[in-house]
């Protein structure tokens, strides 16, 4: 998760990652194939039944004595890079191997480096946009930063969803409000799922209040099955027809209401 407001610049940048002493076993990330380990965040039944492997960006760094810091954009881009490289086998074994690499010291360093580039670019663009502050400026800066960070991985991302409410936001509004009640806009959620299935591979971003959270996605060639990687929870495989429910369950498990969404279609340069 990344803060998309002007406060992002207040986080110090890490240009290098150094290993220190590992945290106690109780605070370390378990093996991604061991679903029953009590250190994992508990999943709702709807997600646990489609889980291929587990992951948690908040504790994987503990295994290497590295300070915790959100790196969902870096992890999602690393995951998509593996998918493009042909490592897209949809089996619990292959999924666990992908998660093990992402959680390894090398995987964390790669993800943190890319995410730090994203964070630094975002800070720079936010400073440029300071003359016109607001959610729109922050979101635009975040979009451009993600596109540039993807270039480091040899990926070309293209945002495909467009908000039609003249809000000026570079994402699709995914909620509707009735009085004090805010609920998911089913039409927007349907557009999100259609974009994922149509574009096959890429990064999905959830915009929730002042937080942006990135997930990777990959869809089978026939469009019938989808794999989602959430850096907070792990890898999930579902029928495309159940994609909307899966995304809602993930956002609920993450505690991130779907305020806005964007799909960044991914291609290799």
UniProtKB/Swiss-Prot annotation:
Residues 13-27 have a biased composition (Polar residues). Pfam families: Peptidase_C58. The keyword Ribonucleoprotein does not apply. Its EC number is 3.4.22.-. The keyword Protein biosynthesis does not apply. It comes from the Bacteria. SUPFAM superfamilies: Cysteine proteinases. One of its GO terms (biological process) is proteolysis. One of its GO terms (molecular function) is cysteine-type endopeptidase activity. It is an enzyme of class 3 (hydrolase). Belongs to the peptidase C58 family. This is Probable cysteine protease avirulence protein AvrPpiC2.
């Amino acid at each position: 998760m990344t803060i998309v407001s002007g406060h992002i610049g207040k986080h110090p940048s890490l240009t290098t990652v150094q290993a220190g002493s590992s945290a106690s076993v109780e605070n370390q990330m378990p093996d991604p194939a061991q679903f029953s380990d009590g250190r994992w965040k508990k999943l709702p039944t709807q997600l646990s039944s489609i889980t291929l492997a587990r992951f948690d960006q908040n504790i994987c760094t503990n295994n290497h004595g590295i300070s915790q810091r959100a790196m969902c954009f870096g992890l999602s881009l690393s995951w998509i890079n593996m998918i493009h490289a042909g490592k897209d086998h949809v089996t619990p074994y292959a999924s666990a191997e992908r998660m093990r690499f992402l959680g390894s010291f090398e995987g964390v360093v790669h993800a943190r480096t890319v995410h730090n580039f994203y964070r630094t670019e975002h800070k720079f663009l936010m400073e440029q946009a300071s003359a016109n502050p607001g959610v729109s400026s922050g979101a635009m800066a975040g979009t451009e930063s993600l596109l540039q960070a993807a270039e480091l991985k040899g990926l070309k991302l293209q945002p495909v969803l467009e908000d039609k409410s003249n809000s000026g936001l570079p994402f699709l509004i995914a909620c509707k409000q009735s009085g004090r009640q805010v609920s998911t806009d089913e039409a927007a959620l349907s557009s999100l799922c259609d974009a994922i299935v149509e574009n096959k591979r890429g990064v999905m971003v959830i915009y929730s209040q002042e937080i942006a959270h990135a997930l990777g996605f990959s869809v089978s060639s026939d469009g019938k099955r989808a794999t989602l990687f959430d850096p907070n929870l792990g890898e999930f495989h579902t029928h495309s027809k159940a994609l909307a429910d899966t995304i809602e369950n993930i956002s609920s498990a993450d505690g991130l209401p779907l305020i806005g969404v964007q799909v960044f279609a991914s291609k290799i340069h």
